[in-house]
C-alpha cells in the first residue's frame, strides 16, 4: 500500500511538472459535438493551418478526438490559425483562432451539422499491400445496424463474433472467446464501470440494447496500462447521452421479445436516454403449452443515462444498467422444483472536466452488484423431500480517477488510479426456509480492498511508427 501511495504522489508531481514545463507555448483544446443531438463525436479529424490558401497542402499539425469527444493541440506560438474540423457524415467546419498571448490555453466547443453525402460509383483496382495489424477495433452504431440480426434485432455479442480473432462456443451461445481467452477474461466496461456478467442465459444475448450505444471499442490483445484486471481483451462501451433536439422514442415488437427507447432534453443543458427490453417466452409457454414440463424463462434489461453540461469545460453524467434473468420449473406438482435467478445492477457518476492547462480529468464513482441464486427441490410432496439453496452476491464500491495530457504534438500522457471495495456474500443451505430464504448457520462473508495505479505515454513518431509504453501496479487485500 505504501508503494501505491508513493506512486499516486509521483503521478501528481509528474502531471504538475509536465503541465508547467510547456513554458511560453499555447494550447488549443475542446470538445466536438453533434449540433442536433448534442452527442460528442469520437474520431473527428482536426487539421491546423496558418493560411486559408494552403488547405490543399499538408497541415502544420493535426489530431483526432478521443472517446470523450475531446482534443488538444499543444506547443503553439502566438499567431492566427485556422482549424479544419472533419467528420464522416457531417459538414466540414473551419474555425478561426487568434492566439494573442493573453491566455495560455484556448478551450473550444465545436458543433458540426449532419450532412448526407451522395457519391458516384468508384471502382478501385490494385494489389493488396502489407499493413500493420492493430488489435483495436472501433465499431460504430451505424455499422452495428448493418450487421446480420437474430429475430430481427441486432445483438452486440453476435455482431462482434463476425470480427477476426473473436470466436463463439456454439451457434446458441454468444459468449466471446477472444484470442483463446474465456468470456470471463474480457474486461467489459460501460461508461467506465465494470459489468461482471454482460449476458443473458447461456450468453444467448447481451445485456446491452444496440440502440443505446454511442461508441464501442474492442481491444483484442496487448491492451494499454489504463486497462487491467483481465487477461484476454477489453470491451469498452459508451452509452448515448440522448438528443437535445426534441422528445422522441422507438418501440419494437417481436414474437418472443420487445423493446422500447426514449430520449430527449430535460432542460437547456441536460438530456436523457432510457432503453429497455423484455423477453416473455414464459408467458407464451403458459398460454399455448401450459401443461408442458419444459423450463420457463424470461429476462429484461434497462440501460439509461442522464447528461448535464455544467460548462464548456465540464460535463457530468449518471449512467445505469439493470438486467434480470429468471429460469424456473413450470409447476410445483412435478417431482422436481427449481428456481434460478441472476441480475446485474450498475450505477455510475461520471465527471469530465478540463483544467486551465488543458489537462483532461475523468472521475468515476460506481456502485456494482451482481447476484446469482438457485433453489432446487426434489419430491416436494413426499416425506423424503430435499431442498438445496445457494446464492452468491457481489457488491462493489468503486472509484476511478483518470488524467490525460497532450504535452507535445506527438506525445500523450495518461495516468490514474483505481480504488475498490468488494463485499462477497456466499450462502448455501440444505434446509431451505421458505420464510427466511436462508440458513443463518451456512455461508461466508468475504470482504476485500483493491487498488491500482497506472502510467503510460503514447508517442506518434511517424505515420507508420508509434509506441505505447506504460505500467500498472496492483494492491489487493482480503479479510475473511
PLM features per residue range, with description:
Residues 33, 44-52, 86-90, 100-153, ...:
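Short, acidic, small-residue-rich periplasmic hinge/interaction motif at the N-terminus
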Residues 162-163, 207-248, 259-261, 268:
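A beta-strand signature from Gram-negative outer-membrane beta-barrel systems
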Residues 31-41:
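Structural motif
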Residues 52-70:
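Short, acidic Ser/Thr/Gly-rich low-complexity loop/linker segments typical of extracellular
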Residues 148-197, 214:
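Extracytoplasmic beta-strand/coil segments of soluble accessory domains associated
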Residues 74, 146-148, 193-219:
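Short acidic/polar hinge/loop motifs at secondary-structure boundaries
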Residues 244-245, 265-342, 372:
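Periplasmic-side early beta-strands and strand-to-turn transitions of outer-membrane beta-barrels
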Residues 307-325, 341-480:
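Face-selective signature of the C-terminal outer-membrane beta-barrel domain
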